[in-house]
Each structure stands twice: as structure tokens, then as C-alpha cells.
Amino acid sequence: MLKKISFKKLELKPELENKNESTIIPCAPKELLLICPKCKKTLLKSELADNLDVCRECGYHFRISARKRIGITVDNETFVEYDRELRSKNILNFPGYDEKLKTAIKENGENEAVICGIGKIEGFECAIFAMEPFFMMGSMGCVVGEKIARLFELATDKSIPVIGFTVSGGARMQEGIMSLMQMAKISGAVKRHSNNGNLYVAVLTDPTTGGVTASFAMQGDIIVSEPDTLIGFAGPRVIEQTIRRSLPDGFQRAEFLMERGFLDSIVGRNELKKYLGNILMLHNVEAR
């Protein structure tokens, strides 16, 4: 039930105040509204959720959790999660890492920055992973790499496609070189999956950067992106500081990359499930 909207009197300067009138403005609770960062319009959170967290005014795609991503993409009651119990450890005794992990687990309710499993999309069975942007910015550590590599190996054994939703700030610095090794490990699993004639569709969401972009995010047979997704290795500011030149408008955004052949398609969130279902159908995946 919605809370009763409160009002407060607008304080006016003496020279502007009308003795016979009082002015009031609505003061809505913060839990009901938010501001779109792109068009600056005020949005009802309930209406935004009904539209899959896409702004109806400008089409801005808000970031969503991995659990919600799977919920809006996979057919009801078909998803079976794998390796949920795996958790990262502070193998390098990096200062503050244990506390960051505990906080991330408590705030997100997830054990790691990726969810992996098998389900159906429009009736077609596939392996699915979705990275979690709210768990240490979707950073890739040993457990993230292990879970995704295991999923590709499982998909290879079952001869089913993989649909992967990427969102990440890159390799997890608290795990040092071990996090970078996950790039090679996952890439090897992707290659074996491909060598067996299986399909891999990578869906890039905002932002997909760092070691994730430099490995499995760009290894898909078909590479799709949501609109206006930031895709790159180093960030724009780092590049500008390095080359000491201004970057072109839209640099590293999905539309910029699409024009230059790095992407196969840009698909809005509302159309994505149907789009993926059509791809699975066209690649002769048996519906069950």
C-alpha cells in the first residue's frame, strides 16, 4: 500500500509573498520516486519496474541484478542454479578484502558476482550466466571464473548453447594475477564449447569493461548489447589522459561499436527474450 503523500509549505521571500495565498508543493517519499540520469524526468519506481527498469521517456536502461535478469529472461520455473555455494577467499591476504566480501554478500544476498545455471528461453534449453553488477561491480575473481568455466564445460557435455549476460568493472584487483588467469581459463572453456559445434551468445550490458571485455564477453558467436552500453577495456578518461587527445562523441558506447562492426545487434531489454528465443530456434535447438 502506498504511503500517504505529505506536503510542506514553500517559504517565499517577503517581496514575493501573497498575503491571501499559501503555496504548497508535494514532497513524495524517496522510496516511491527516482530521477532518470539521462532525461532527468521523475519516475515512479513501480512503473519503472513494470517496464523492466527501462525509462519510458528516453529509453534509458537502468542496471538490474543478476537474479532479476534471469527472472525476466528465462521461462518460469525452468531455471536450475549451479554452484551457488561457491565463495571467494582472501587468498592473498589483501587488506580489507574480507570485509568487502562480507558486505557484498550481506547487501546483495548473493555469494558471488555471477549466477550460473540451466533453463529454457521460449522453450529452448540453454546454459545461462548473468553477472551481478551490485556485487563488487561484477568484478571477476577466481570463483566467478570457475563458475563460468564450469558452466561452459557442462554445456559442452550436454551439447546445449550458452547465453551469457556480462556486466563488469573487470578483473578483481584484490585477487591479483589469479583474477587475470580467469580470462585464459574461461576462454579455453569457450573454445572447447565452440569446437563441439555449440552456440554462444554474449549479451553485453552496461558497463562491460576490463578483463571481461578482453576475454569471454567478445568471444560470442553472436554478440548483442543493450542500448547505450559502455563497452571497452580502459575507461574513456584513462585513454584521454594517456593519448592526450579528446575522444569522439559516443566513444565506447554500443552504438559507436555497432557502426564499426564490433557488435551484431543492439536490442532493447523489452525485446531481448524474444530475440534470444528466435536465435535459439534458428540454430536448431530442440524445444522440449
From Swiss-Prot:
Pathway: Lipid metabolism; malonyl-CoA biosynthesis; malonyl-CoA from acetyl-CoA: step 1/1. It catalyses: N(6)-carboxybiotinyl-L-lysyl-[protein] + acetyl-CoA = N(6)-biotinyl-L-lysyl-[protein] + malonyl-CoA. Transmembrane segments: none annotated. Its cofactor is Zn(2+). A zinc finger (C4-type) spans 36-58. GO terms for cellular component: acetyl-CoA carboxylase complex. Pfam families: Carboxyl_trans, Zn_ribbon_ACC. Residues 32-288 form the CoA carboxyltransferase N-terminal domain. Binds 1 zinc ion per subunit. Gene3D superfamilies: 2-enoyl-CoA Hydratase, Chain A, domain 1. GO terms for biological process: fatty acid biosynthetic process; malonyl-CoA biosynthetic process. Acetyl-CoA carboxylase is a heterohexamer composed of biotin carboxyl carrier protein (AccB), biotin carboxylase (AccC) and two subunits each of ACCase subunit alpha (AccA) and ACCase subunit beta (AccD). This is Acetyl-coenzyme A carboxylase carboxyl transferase subunit beta. It comes from Ruminiclostridium cellulolyticum (strain ATCC 35319 / DSM 5812 / JCM 6584 / H10).
